[in-house]
Swiss-Prot record:
Gene assigned in the entry: ilvD
Modified residues (N6-carboxylysine): 124
Species of origin: Yersinia pestis
Name of the featured protein: Dihydroxy-acid dehydratase
Listed EC numbers: 4.2.1.9
Lineage of source species: Bacteria, Pseudomonadati, Pseudomonadota, Gammaproteobacteria, Enterobacterales
Enzyme class: lyase
SUPFAM superfamilies to which the protein is assigned, alphabetical: IlvD/EDD N-terminal domain-like, LeuD/IlvD-like
């Protein structure tokens, strides 16, 4: 029978000092026999996805206490990628994921907590906490802050839905008036919550449902809706039961590595491909799998991407549907239901409720369940009122979207495309692979050939795009923006957005060893591995070189002879210590970022630390 970790600090005369300090936090004699459960919050006033979380940790803690546990809350940092975008702040975004994972490990191990409830929401916070959960392998339940309501505005006598990306595109479009741009800006992000499309934050929160570590509804139920409160209460109640299953019943199936196992990771990736999720999810799933010592790699993702259809199309791939519409159609469980009926899922998986996949679908799939309470939960909709408060409204749709032929979620037979929403491409310029969000690529751009326009930084590329130096047919190559080369693997949302603003969104491609925001669409290929700073071929591309992109056949090739590439490599390596570094780029890089770069692996490994350099 496993021993409660917390007994290390609460039992025995030699722990009198520790108990004295525990008493100073409010614990009593009765508490020293109970499980100590960490409530890992991420409240901050910097991030709309987290601005409403201040009191939600207390809500979870009270339920833990009522269920027989001891709750101790602490906070992690949280970076808003949208606010950090387009300037030096974005260098810190991906490295913050490692800091979050480490800080959770530090706090939980230093104080010998028995289990965790992770209150996450936005881009790097959910992955960082997921990495920590699989690293620690103690009972955990995730409950996120929930999606933002979609913005709405009236243009040309028509009400349209908006999100952050619309504000960015219009802000850079010279043909849009200042008044119209300001109107869109004020309407795009109306409430607290993670940005309303299938961007990185919402993608990861959906994947946590598929991994089995979050409760049904977690990925899609709006942050503002009163129903979301029940998820927090249930998380507090169920974590105590989950903890006791492991420590008092020796039930190892309660541990995250046994819930989020290889089969669950495959299901999560299948979901991601089917819903056209953010390309960042590939990076984060690979990183989390390494923390959990799970054999899940780019090879698995490539295999899955070839057989999974695109069943759910959401912003930024369409303006018609946002997360509130996904929820109305049945949320994550609704998509999983269609994938299961298509015979694409591993059924031998479970979740934190102890339910297997069949039981979960019977209880929560709106196409199967007879539970009116579940149907009512999925009818939860937006109020259209600007607010930063959680659970502030109780509006409902008059009916669910169960149209699986032309609705938000489709059956395999009526899929948006029989090819999934993500693809892994291989070729000489990406020997270890690269990623494209095919859900956002125009059908006419699935094969593309064009001359390279090479830039040593995102900033240089943005200046060229807005300055008219990029023309239709070009392949914009942005290099030395990978985990080491950036450092920090910046998101390239501004270059892709500005290509659209300049009317080039469907006539240019973009290739980078950096990454993209979940809000990116168009022929945007990222995560090129190996990166330029690691000697990758992308570092040898010259202006005018032709690049062939073939998404249907999963290929990407730099059309330059082997002899010429060998000569270029010899020339580059002759620079010695200055080899494989950006030419003429001026960028202030702090010691903290340099430390990250020293240990970072390329994107095909999840951009995690190179354990071989740490003796691991």
């Amino acid at each position: 029978m496993p021993k409660y970790r917390s007994h290390t600090t609460t039992h025995g005369r030699n722990m009198a000092g520790a108990r004295a300090l525990w008493r100073a936090t409010g614990m009593t004699d009765d508490d020293f026999g109970k499980p100590i459960i960490a409530v890992v919050n991420s409240f901050t006033q910097f991030v709309p996805g987290h601005v409403h979380l201040r009191d939600l940790g207390k809500l979870v803690a009270e339920q833990i206490v009522a269920s027989g546990g001891v709750a101790k809350e602490f906070n992690t940092i949280a970076v808003d990628d949208g606010i950090a975008m387009g300037h030096g702040g974005m260098l810190y975004s991906l490295p913050s994921r490692e800091l979050i994972a480490d800080s959770v490990e530090y706090m939980v191990n230093a104080h010998c907590a028995d289990a965790m409830v992770c209150i996450s929401n936005c881009d790097k916070i959910t992955p960082g906490m997921l990495m920590a959960s699989l690293r620690l392998n103690i009972p955990v339940i995730f409950v996120s802050g929930g999606p933002m309501e979609a913005g709405k505005t009236k243009l040309s006598d028509k009400i349209i839905k908006l999100d952050l990306i619309d504000a960015m595109i219009q802000g850079a479009n010279p043909n849009v008036s200042d008044e119209e741009s300001a109107q869109i800006e004020r309407s795009a992000c109306p409430t607290c919550g993670s940005c309303s499309g299938m961007f990185t934050a919402n993608s990861m929160n959906c994947l946590n449902e598929a991994l089995g570590l979050a409760l049904p509804g977690n990925g899609s139920l709006l942050a503002t809706h009163a129903d979301r409160k029940q998820l927090f209460l249930d998380a507090g109640k169920h974590i105590v039961a989950l903890t006791k299953r492991y420590y008092e019943q020796d039930d190892v199936s309660a541990l995250p590595r046994n819930i989020a196992n290889k089969a669950a990771f495959e299901n999560a990736m299948i979901l991601d491909i089917a819903m056209g999720g953010s390309t960042n999810t590939v990076l984060h799933l690979l990183a989390a799998a390494q923390e959990g010592e799970i054999d899940f790699s780019m090879t698995d993702i490539d295999h899955l991407s070839r057989k999974v259809p695109h069943l759910c199309k959401v912003a930024p791939s369409t303006q018609k549907y946002h997360m509130e519409d996904v929820h109305r159609a049945g949320g994550v469980i609704g998509i999983l239901g269609e994938l299961d009926r298509a015979g694409l899922l591993n059924r031998d998986v479970s979740n934190v409720l102890g339910l297997n996949l069949t039981q979960t679908l019977e209880a929560y799939d709106v196409m199967l369940t007879q539970d009116e309470g579940v149907k009512q939960m999925y009818a939860a909709g937006p109020a259209g009122i600007r607010t930063t408060k959680a659970f502030s409204q109780d509006c409902r749709y008059p009916s669910l979207d169960t149209d699986r032929e032309e609705g938000c979620i489709r059956t395999r037979e009526h899929a948006y495309s029989q090819d999934g929403g993500l693809a892994v491409l291989y070729g000489n310029i990406a020997a270890d692979g690269c990623i494209v969000k095919t859900a956002g690529v125009d059908k006419d751009s699935l094969t593309f050939r064009g001359p390279a326009k090479v830039f040593e930084s995102q900033d240089e590329a943005v200046e060229a795009i807005l300055g008219g130096k990029v023309v239709a047919g070009d392949v914009v190559v942005i290099r030395y923006e990978g985990p080491k080369g950036g450092p920090g693997m910046q998101e390239m949302l501004y270059p892709t957005t500005y290509l659209k603003s300049m009317g080039l969104g469907k006539s240019c491609a973009l290739l980078t060893d950096g990454r993209f925001s979940g809000g990116t669409s168009g022929l945007s290929i990222g995560h090129v591995s190996p990166e330029a700073a690691s000697g990758g071929l992308i570092g040898l591309v010259q202006d005018g070189d032709f690049i062939n992109i073939d998404i249907p056949n999963r290929g990407i090739v730099l059309d330059v002879s082997e002899a010429e590439l060998a000569a270029r490599r010899e020339t580059e390596e002759a620079h010695g210590d200055a080899a494989w570094s950006p030419k003429g780029r001026e960028r202030q890089v702090s010691y903290a970022l340099r430390a990250y770069a020293m240990l970072a692996t390329s994107a095909d490994k999840g951009a995690v630390r190179d354990k071989s350099k740490l003796g691991g």
